């Protein structure tokens, strides 16, 4: 793709997200979502591969349907109460339609089927954009309208997402599909706490973006697409393999790494608000996600494939990759736990 066109598309995507985050009007929020969607579709299909074309078509159809439902929710509320302000959402059908529309855009269960298939048909960097940047605008709308959406719907969707994200990831050998189910599980934690403490959901989203970015950048750097490919990471670079291990364990929420803090705080808030059974179920489902992170960690750091090549330590060869951004992201994703109380005050 032409670099100028690529820059224009990325700028449009950023502008759409900022427009949605800063708007309180239904039409301007919808316009930002549409701008975001139309900018990412050429990026998904830029490889001209049949899988990329299929992924872009699926993404377009599901996002168009959810945007139409989002706009219908605003029209219904405006017809009933004569206002386009999102803060005055009082119509019950509009609340339900808004919940379903945002859940579809985020890829929450039970409307999650499109996310693994779309990620599998895209390059790793594009998959990273879909799982991180494309979640910001819908989550901003969800946090903006947290007190207007029925809490029962969000709690059920959150619990379903954590269960399906954990179970779905166990059966995957493709890393992009595994990260898709990881995204579904993490979004389940976010949407669950949104109805209780929106600021904690924002903190969780920030850490999720850091952890996912560092993990998927290592996958991109080492050209890993399947679990079998991760066996070569140690031969490529023992340091990278160790950091990949720590990033995965942090993504799974294992203490004392940074990924433990949002799960710990969310479980604490749920028990404080007398939702102990829900907190117990979510803690159990977190073990499912941790299982496939541990499996990937074991394969990438403790197994080396059989080879007849004399030179296995390719890390001795000089690499031309620039890893300065990756290094800073990994440091943030691993060692933010000690300053967690300062960040959530």
Swiss-Prot record:
Any one GO BP annotation for this protein: mitochondrial electron transport, NADH to ubiquinone
GO molecular function, one term: NADH dehydrogenase (ubiquinone) activity
Pfam families on file: NADH_dehy_S2_C, Proton_antipo_M
Any Gene Ontology CC annotation: mitochondrial inner membrane
Lineage: superkingdom: Eukaryota
Functional description taken from the UniProt entry: Core subunit of the mitochondrial membrane respiratory chain NADH dehydrogenase (Complex I) that is believed to belong to the minimal assembly required for catalysis. Complex I functions in the transfer of electrons from NADH to the respiratory chain. The immediate electron acceptor for the enzyme is believed to be ubiquinone.
Membrane-spanning residues: 1-21, 25-45, 59-79, 96-116, 123-143, 148-168, 191-211, 240-260, 274-294, 324-344
Enzyme class at the top of the EC tree: translocase
The gene coding this protein: MT-ND2
Protein name, UniProt field: NADH-ubiquinone oxidoreductase chain 2
Keyword terms, alphabetized: Electron transport, Membrane, Mitochondrion, Mitochondrion inner membrane, NAD, Respiratory chain, Translocase, Transmembrane, Transmembrane helix, Transport, Ubiquinone
Major subcellular site: mitochondrion
Record's subcellular location: Mitochondrion inner membrane
Originating species: Varanus timorensis (Timor monitor)
Family note: Belongs to the complex I subunit 2 family.
E.C. code: 7.1.1.2
Membrane topology field: Multi-pass membrane protein
Catalytic activity from the UniProt record: a ubiquinone + NADH + 5 H(+)(in) = a ubiquinol + NAD(+) + 4 H(+)(out)
